[in-house]
Amino acid sequence: MSELDNKKDKSKDSNKKPKKPGAFSIGNIIIFVIVALLLIWVVFAFLPNNPGTNKSFDGFLKDLQDAARLGDDTIFFRNISFDVVLSRFNVTFVNGATTSSYFVNYPSSVAFQNLQIPGTTFTGLELATLAIANTSASGIGTLNFSGLVTPTNQALAILLSLIPTFLFVGIIFFVYKMQSKANGGMGGFNPGKNQAERIYTKIKFSDIAGNEEVKEEVAELVDYLKNPKKYSASGARIPRGILLGGPPGTGKTLLAKATAGEANVPFYFISGSNFVELFVGVGAKRVRELFKEARKSSPAIIFIDELDAVGRSRGAGIGGGNDEREQTLNQLLVEMDGMTENSGLLVMAATNRTDVLDPALLRPGRFDRTVTVGLPNVKDREAILKLHAKGKRISSEVSFQQLAKRTPGYSGAQLENVINEASLLSVREDTKIITLEQFDEAIDRVMSGPAKKSRVITKEELTAVAYHEAGHAVVGTQLRKGVKVQKITIIPRGSAGGYNLMIPEEEKYNSSKSELIAMITSFMGGRAAEQIIYGEKEVSTGARDDIKKATSIARKMVTEWGMSDLGPIMYEEDTSNPFLGRDYTKNQLFSDHIAREIDTEVRKIILTAEQKAIEVIQENREMLELIKEALLENETIVDEEIQYIAKNLKLPSMRTKAKSENVNQIRNVDELVKEVKDQTLIIKDKNDKKIKDSENNIKTDESLDIK
């Protein structure tokens, strides 16, 4: 199951609720700048000047009379201004080479107010700013100070002094209101606001490929959302909630959108993490607001993605019953169980961790149904690939059926990524159509990452990698019935120097003991080939991942599946996540003595498989050399070439290079077999000895325990 291209989703943006204007749009920034400049001007305009020292009125009067009566151009007033806030004169007086500044408190004497200065002796006074009310002295006639000096209005002065404070408060209020518009209701602090996004989706079930059973399970809910009264009249109770579980990328969210699109009802989307906040009670309030708004739009769908973020089992976290997450979960339980019967409100949720959810969520009346959206089978994968390939120019040689067989275990999201990677490769290589080779490369990219062709590898190391991968292919071809070696490559990808792709001819959900043993033997084929060619002391670290996988299977055979001499007993309980496949803990249910026996059984299975791999490669040494040569020549060989080599014991003519050294190497295979025969027998004797030693150790341990 998978989602359509992003371009199709963009065409539906018109159905979404318009976004609220942000607090930092261009218009708001301009307003902020204007207000800030106004504030700066007011502050500086009303800041008191520092005119110097205080001078008595008599001293000021003397300076004024001297400047007016004396015929000396070097004595004059440069500036006289009146401070309406502080009610005083600010004076700048020039006396020859000396310039002094002082201030004079506003005089109330009648002599000053009635002072008259003859204009004829008004020499060098420079009273362009003596105009206390910005009036210029012309130097002619008589200047009456009483007409120029107006007593200050104290109330006005106080009001003007408060302007900066009022302006500052206004700016704060303005910013607060703008934040309120952007965040809704409570300015920049509204933690309880509903975080769900309401959208109308046009996605239909026809836009989804695969998982037909899941679509049928959900389809009846569409009819309920369209005709809720029909179900009420018949006495039926439609599930209030549906939980979609499954691995990542299988289309759980897309399925919920398609349900809303088919029913043509509002769709409220929210992530489980949106309910969890720092402040206590915020999550519970958001749950209440979400359901309150959804009921107003009933019928509607509430979809909670990643439900495990808020729906984990209570009591398992830090904080006990006062944990904020638990309060949010309690509110969610109440809202789901407290809804009016058949109110037209459907709750859907998706999670990859159904194993950690609180049992109260899964009981009838809340999430009545739990639907597992699993990985697609081969038929579903083919349908998904065809769905995503619509509108793309693809070569006629591409078979989606074969591509589906080559991608076992891929989710819908990964299959969409395969199509997209192939399209990108087509653009990069400037081809008009997407070729089969580009699809092959896209599958390899999604599986293991891009090829590292620039990595410098010595010829000896490359030959060792070729032998290693050829060993896997030989054992897999000869032992694993129903499994096809699809592709072998020695091109480095990721951390691997090469890889061997084996896929089952038919997908199976259960494996027999013989199939598991064959799988382990196939994993040991690479290391076995290295032992035969280079000796036991020269095996490389390239088998690390093979050993890890083989050991994991062998241990599960002993501890979980009862496929050993210890009998059908479960010694370890696997608590790994069913969809994510990760082992978090292992519950040990056995004694130390049983633990030693388990280790011995695991070792016995691995060593027996390794010995079997050596025997198979020894019997098919010629095939090993041919596959190695094909890999060194072409770096990658596919199923048809592998089958040709296995059947005819020669390289395919279309891939063979006319090099005498290669022909000579192939002709001398019998000599190589003879040379390593003794070495193989030595390895076999060593492995037999290891197995016997392990069995003897068990017997010794048992005798000690009995004693």
From Swiss-Prot:
ATP binds at residues 246-253. The active site is at residue 469. Keywords: ATP-binding, Cell membrane, Hydrolase, Membrane, Metal-binding, Metalloprotease, Nucleotide-binding, Protease, Transmembrane, Transmembrane helix, Zinc. PROSITE patterns: AAA. The keyword Transport does not apply. It is found in: Cell membrane. GO terms for molecular function: ATP binding; ATP hydrolysis activity; ATP-dependent peptidase activity; metalloendopeptidase activity; zinc ion binding. Homohexamer. This is ATP-dependent zinc metalloprotease FtsH. The gene is ftsH.
